[in-house]
């Protein structure tokens, strides 16, 4: 246990070795801006201390941290440094405890900052006493620690294909969530026992290389090579991409259905919101950035750029359109309200044009500054290509019928602008500027 600090230092260097102090300053500045923004939202919403006692607050904290840690750890196991870590004479328990701290700082803090700002804000305006503030900060901190450790346990069992243990820990977590809703007094003791189990029994055996890829991976390797199959192979084998896409599809459907039920948005706007939420899903849009390690090989092979681009576009647009159709069918079935033909065509145009723009933007300005996939998925740069899609949504203001003609024109103008930019995935002269 005495080597936790050196391991933690190495893990932080693995994430931030290229930028160093610049990354630290950028993260600190981002947290300050986020804190100011969230304080403004709390003030505008008039949130009081009664919100702290709501069950959904604890459940949101648990689920959010678990989801983010699960994505991070499953992506982490794909990195080469993890194979080296398995060979080094270091304590497995110390490694994963140190990794839990790194995950909190790098992945969870900015997503769950609200839970720590809220008690401090209420203390600042005199709503909470000092003792109450410490109580809520301690409570949220405890559940943060629990959810991170649980996420590490769940993701390791998933990666190592320990299905029985995966289901067992998932069942315990379900009991924790039920306890938080029905028996709050039993929640913390149950979490404490689960933490001890994870740290004492599971953590010491987690620093072992996972088994090789399964049958799907072998089938794809034996099949005739094509970039389209290659994208599907990557998507199926990448837990981060697969889970992020599934969660975003579920969230977009749930969020839109709630907005429709409360009457905040009308039916037409709801389906546009679904399109926007699906389009913001970034891991499946960074199909050139993810090729960083294979870039030089792809450049030297006799490959037509258009062949690669259209294969990636077919994959990406197919995922977006398929997800949209599924969400629309479920929302329409539950609400009993079907989507109009014009709105359906409008949303499909948004998705197809948005996919083309995001993919073109990623080809012309790929992000090669990452060292691990975890950095690519969690960095703010993943949303850069989404900004070019915003004019498409402005075109909606022209009305449904008119926007059907305006959206393709706006998309072509944006793509033309992007293609006129210097550099790109295949431009080796811009190698340093792209960060490769």
From Swiss-Prot:
Induction field: Transcription is highly induced by oxygen limitation and is under dual and independent control of Spo0A-AbrB and ResDE.
Function: Involved in the production of the bacteriocin subtilosin. Required for immunity to subtilosin.
Residue intervals passing through the bilayer: 27-47, 55-75, 113-133, 134-154, 164-184, 187-207, 240-260, 270-290, 315-335, 395-415
Encoding gene (name): albD
Domain of life of the native organism: Bacteria
UniProtKB keywords: Antibiotic biosynthesis, Bacteriocin biosynthesis, Bacteriocin immunity, Cell membrane, Membrane, Transmembrane, Transmembrane helix
Membrane-topology annotation of the record: Multi-pass membrane protein
Biological process annotations from GO: bacteriocin biosynthetic process; bacteriocin immunity
Cell compartment(s), UniProt: Cell membrane
Name of the protein in question: Antilisterial bacteriocin subtilosin biosynthesis protein AlbD
GO cellular component: plasma membrane
């Amino acid at each position: 246990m005495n080597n936790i600090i050196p391991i933690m230092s190495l893990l932080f260097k693995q994430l931030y070795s290229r930028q160093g102090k610049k990354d630290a300053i950028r993260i600190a500045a981002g947290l300050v801006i986020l804190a100011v923004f969230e304080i403004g939202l709390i003030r505008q919403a008039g949130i009081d201390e009664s919100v702290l006692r709501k069950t959904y607050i604890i459940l949101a904290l648990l689920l959010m941290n678990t989801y983010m840690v699960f994505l991070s750890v499953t992506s982490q196991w794909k990195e080469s440094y993890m194979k080296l870590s398995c060979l080094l004479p270091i304590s497995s328990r110390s490694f994963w405890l140190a990794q839990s701290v790194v995950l909190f700082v790098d992945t969870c803090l900015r997503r769950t900052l609200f839970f720590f700002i809220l008690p401090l804000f209420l203390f600042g305006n005199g709503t909470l006493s000092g003792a109450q503030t410490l109580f809520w900060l301690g409570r949220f901190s405890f559940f943060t620690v629990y959810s991170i450790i649980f996420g590490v346990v769940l993701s390791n069992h998933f990666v190592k294909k320990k299905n029985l243990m995966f289901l067992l820990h998932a069942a315990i977590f379900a009991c924790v969530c039920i306890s938080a809703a029905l028996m709050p007094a039993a929640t913390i003791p149950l979490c404490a026992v689960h933490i001890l189990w994870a740290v004492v029994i599971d953590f010491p055996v987690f620093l072992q290389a996972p088994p090789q890829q399964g049958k799907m991976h072998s089938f794809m390797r034996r099949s005739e090579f094509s970039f389209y199959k290659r994208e599907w192979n990557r998507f199926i084998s990448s837990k981060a991409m697969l889970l992020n896409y599934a969660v975003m599809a579920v969230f977009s459907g749930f969020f839109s259905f709630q907005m429709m039920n409360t009457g905040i948005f009308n039916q037409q706007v709801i389906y546009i919101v679904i399109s926007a939420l699906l389009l913001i899903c970034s891991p499946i849009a960074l199909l050139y950035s993810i090729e960083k390690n294979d870039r030089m090989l792809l450049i030297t092979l006799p490959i037509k750029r258009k062949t690669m681009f259209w294969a990636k576009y077919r994959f990406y647009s197919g995922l977006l359109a398929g997800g949209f159709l599924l969400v629309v069918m479920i929302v329409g079935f539950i609400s009993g309200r079907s989507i109009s033909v014009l709105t359906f065509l409008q949303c499909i145009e948004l998705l197809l044009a948005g996919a083309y723009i995001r993919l073109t933007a990623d080809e012309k300005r790929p992000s090669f500054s990452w060292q691990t996939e975890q950095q690519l998925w969690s960095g703010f740069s993943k949303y850069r290509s989404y900004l070019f899609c915003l004019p498409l949504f402005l075109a909606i203001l022209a009305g449904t019928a008119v926007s059907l003609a305006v959206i393709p024109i706006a998309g072509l103008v944006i793509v033309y602008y992007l293609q006129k930019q210097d550099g790109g995935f295949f431009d080796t002269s811009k190698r340093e500027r792209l960060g490769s």
